[in-house]
Amino acid sequence: MQEKSKPVDNLRADAEKIITRAIAAVLPDAAVERALKGKTFLGRVYLVAAGKAAWQMAHAARACLQDNFCGGVVVTKYGHVNGEIADVACFEGGHPVPDENSLRGTDAALALTEDLTESDTVVFLLSGGGSALFEKPLLPLAELQDVTNQLLAASADIVEINTIRKRLSAVKGGRFARHCAPAQVFAVVLSDILGDPLDMIASGPTYPDSSSCAQALDIAKRYGLRLSERAWALLAQETPKTLTNVETQITGSVRELCAAAAAACEALGYEPMILTDCLCCEACEAGSMLASIARTHARDGKNLAFLMGGETVVHLRGKGLGGRNQEIALSAALGIEGLSNALVFSVGSDGTDGPTDAAGGIADGETAQLMRQKGVDAVQSLNDNDAYHALGAVGGLIKTGATGTNVNDVTVLLLRTAE
């Protein structure tokens, strides 16, 4: 690989520091401890944690829950269990599509919380990814997997997907809280959806559902979903609209992630500007937009940082491998080619991006040229949704490993003056 210029070296070093500091600021340990500090539960206490950050949240919570603790269950993504937790059974399952292990972990949680009394409390820790990981389907698993894959392939957004999921599940849309009744549920939620809609985060197992049957049916028809008669009938059934046994506390969000990244940029000498913390568009469009901003401001003579937080979507056109953050980086690479002082990175706060081992992607003004030297057609790779292999060929993958948190993604454009 050709030797990189000093500005690019500096940009990549800065990017690594920004990623590390931003993710550290939204780790759930301290947030869970704050939520449980001073809380007193008089009866028996049970712990259920679901989502990509479930193990980390449960580990922190277990240290706080000593008196009357009667057991717990964690259901998280493969590779996200980091050890044993006393008196807590840990399960790993499929994401973004549920599998048999997702169901096995959820069954354990349901069994743990059966036949509770009014004096009992279920501490429920919820994070993104819970829609796939915490599941008791009202359809055969294979059929539910097919519906999920249809929605993902159609580029449905997370609210649309979860509106459908709620009606096909025995635990979503407030139904888990109803299962726990008459016990009290204290829910601590790590938000991964823009605007923090509690009924949509992991499909709201303990929160009243604000969506309607009419909306669910409209989504199914608009995307041309191929559904069985049973599935159509379930979409027409309403979910719980009121719950009286739940207290909810939200902690951690993409807004905090962006603020932490901006603070890290400022500490490194950049002038940061958060463009949005509600990014929701095609991933390749986000990359192109940042490239346009880079070309507009590349000669301003300042160290600038433009930040966006949220969750883009990928329209599946090919059969390649990648994720939305990698696709942002690949798209940006084409637009910033030749700019020696520009770099774009995009990373998922949970450490995973699509069905890959990467958290995201990074590209600078030399990335597209390096791809050509390696025999990689960047445009074709983008069309094939094959950002993983394209970026991997030139050292453009970001790999953090599982972080233990999940508050959407952060995307950053860095512009640095020559030194």
Specify the residue positions occupied by each region the protein language model found.
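A glycine- and small-aliphatic-rich helix-loop capping segment at beta-alpha/alpha-beta transitions
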Residues: A60-N68, D87-C90, L110-E114, P137-Q150, ...
